[in-house]
Amino acid sequence: MDFREGLRPRRSVRQYIPNRDIPADDIRDILETAMLAPSGRNKQPWEFIVVNDKSKFPEITQAQPYCRFLEEASLAVIVCGNTEEEMAPGAWMVDCAAATENLLLACHAKKLGSCWCGIYPDKERMENFIRLFNLPPHIKPLSLVVIGYPAAEPRQPEDRFKQQKIHMNSW
């Protein structure tokens, strides 16, 4: 299968089969793939908090109100950046965004649904996650990825290629 053909059906999933756990080996594979992401000077400033304790889900949905569908999911991964390990000030955000994308693609490859819910740059959300997970000052939360088994087949995406978005050699 062509890489793009495998990638094209990936969608954000917000409906999950409840009470279905993801095997530990699959979780490890997903995180290993996330860590294959490129990073400035290969600093790899990412840190991952895996949350499979469903008693924490209500607190998470209060901290990030646009992820209420977490309640039915199997787990969540909070992707954080370590500012003591970044290449330059602010580089953790780009590096951790690349790791988040790899994480989403790894979920898709394993037939798991996932949805990227933003934490950064919303200061209140960041503070909520820092408090909720006792993050030290040099660890910054970037994203929350909700993961689970899709309750339904995601609808097929429209063609996203738009020639007008491409600029050759200048604007």
Positions of PLM-derived features:
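Acidic, surface-exposed loops and disordered segments
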Residues: 1-171
